[in-house]
């Protein structure tokens, strides 16, 4: 990939009024319209992508391509995420506006930080410059030979819950937590990334999109087609991640939504009026011919973990979202206070970068 030559007179972004209007035609929610309007002033002084030297492509996903790049002025290495615009006729995709808004507002050690918005040659070329992090947890677990030690697992889950608790305290649901969206620095710090599906929520709860969260990490209430859901959907994903870090295998690998739900029932048992009263009111519940399977078989998959570790895992993977533990309560669980204690992040293992240079 050729390097972009640095312009002697550093370019700045100068969005014209009619371009702003074009962007704002997007069918945003009122709060998001207001937020994007507030970005017009910062955009007028944002830097050009010419200020960065693209080194290699990290990955390409549904919402954009991510490059490893170097700031030509400071020589700092950053992750440069180009927002996909191919199908957008009326401005920036709503998912990208939400991601920018959320990342600008959330400031936490366990959440990836956005540094600035960067523009290309025209309004349809927009980048987010974010802190560069060496690994994603999924890729790392695929290449390391040894599993994480119990103290290291405890540190990773504690950091994950710290980030999730902070998100939920600030009225944000991530809606796509999985090991591939967790980054791991060479200083032993875990960071939550990829906020393309994140949404702010409020009280009372309002209907939200159902088609969220990668299938293997999707909570049962979402699989049963509910539109009214809570941050508990993120907690289910945390439970799946916890199990995956322990075993280095994805816990529930369904081939479809029906198969995923079937695997959940086989592992955790079928719900009853007592264990999950609202289950029978969910849109797709009536289509399941439930065989009576009252037993939770999760312990059989993790026979060697401590009782406290299993208890926390079980509370994170509670079928009934109303009974599922919160992130803040999970951080107070005895699991984090028994031996071995969580390992200091500075003593966590490190590895060469797992990003493939393409």
Swiss-Prot record:
Keyword Methyltransferase applies: no
Catalytic activity: L-seryl-[protein] + ATP = O-phospho-L-seryl-[protein] + ADP + H(+); L-threonyl-[protein] + ATP = O-phospho-L-threonyl-[protein] + ADP + H(+)
Biological process according to GO: protein phosphorylation; regulation of cell cycle
Span of domain Protein kinase: 52-336
Binding site for ATP: 58-66, 81
Matching Gene3D superfamilies: Phosphorylase Kinase, domain 1 (3.30.200.20), Transferase(Phosphotransferase) domain 1 (1.10.510.10)
Keywords: ATP-binding, Kinase, Nucleotide-binding, Serine/threonine-protein kinase, Transferase
Positions annotated as active site in the UniProt record: 176
The keyword Metal-binding is assigned to this record: no
GO cellular component: nucleus
Matching CDD domains: STKc_CDC2L1
Root EC class: transferase
A Pfam family this chain is assigned to: Pkinase
Lineage: superkingdom: Eukaryota
Enzyme Commission number(s) of this protein: 2.7.11.22
InterPro entries: CDK, CDK11/PITSLRE_STKc, Kinase-like_dom_sf, Prot_kinase_dom, Ser/Thr_kinase_AS
Any one GO molecular function term: protein serine kinase activity
Family indicated by similarity: Belongs to the protein kinase superfamily. CMGC Ser/Thr protein kinase family. CDC2/CDKX subfamily.
PANTHER family: CELL DIVISION PROTEIN KINASE, CYCLIN-DEPENDENT KINASE 11
Entry protein name: Cyclin-dependent kinase 11
Organism of provenance: Dictyostelium discoideum (Social amoeba)
């Amino acid at each position: 990939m050729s390097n972009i030559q640095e312009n002697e007179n550093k370019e700045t972004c100068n969005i014209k009024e009619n371009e702003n209007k074009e962007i704002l035609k997007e069918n945003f929610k009122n709060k998001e319209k207001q937020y994007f309007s507030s970005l017009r002033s910062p955009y007028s002084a944002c830097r050009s992508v010419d200020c960065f030297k693209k080194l290699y492509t990290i990955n390409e996903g549904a919402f954009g391509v991510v490059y490893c790049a170097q700031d030509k002025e400071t020589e700092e290495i950053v992750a440069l995420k180009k927002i996909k615009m191919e199908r957008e006729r009326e401005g920036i995709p709503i998912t990208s506006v939400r991601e920018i808004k959320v990342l600008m507002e959330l400031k936490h050690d366990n959440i990836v930080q956005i540094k600035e918005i960067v523009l290309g040659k025209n309004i349809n070329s927009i980048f987010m410059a974010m802190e560069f992090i060496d690994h994603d947890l999924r890729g790392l677990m695929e290449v390391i030979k040894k599993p994480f030690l119990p103290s290291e697992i405890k540190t990773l889950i504690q950091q994950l819950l710290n980030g999730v608790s902070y998100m939920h305290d600030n009225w944000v649901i991530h809606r796509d937590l999985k090991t591939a969206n967790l980054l791991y620095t060479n200083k032993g710090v875990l960071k939550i990334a990829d906020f393309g599906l994140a949404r702010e929520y409020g009280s009372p709860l309002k209907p939200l999109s159902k088609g969220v969260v990668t299938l293997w990490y999707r909570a049962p209430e979402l699989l049963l087609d509910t539109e009214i859901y809570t941050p508990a959907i993120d907690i289910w994903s945390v439970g799946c991640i916890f199990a995956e870090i322990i075993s280095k295998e994805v816990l529930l690998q369904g081939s479809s939504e029906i198969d995923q739900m079937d695997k959940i029932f086989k592992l955790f048992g079928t719900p009853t009026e007592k264990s999950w009263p609202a289950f029978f009111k969910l849109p797709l519940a009536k289509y399941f011919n439930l065989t009576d399977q009252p037993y939770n078989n999760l312990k059989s998959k993790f026979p060697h973990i401590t009782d406290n570790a299993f208890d926390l895992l079980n509370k994170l993977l509670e079928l009934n979202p109303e009974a599922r533990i919160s992130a803040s309560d999970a951080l107070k669980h005895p699991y984090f206070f028994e031996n071995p204690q969580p390992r200091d992040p500075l003593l966590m293992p490190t590895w060469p970068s797992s990003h493939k240079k393409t």
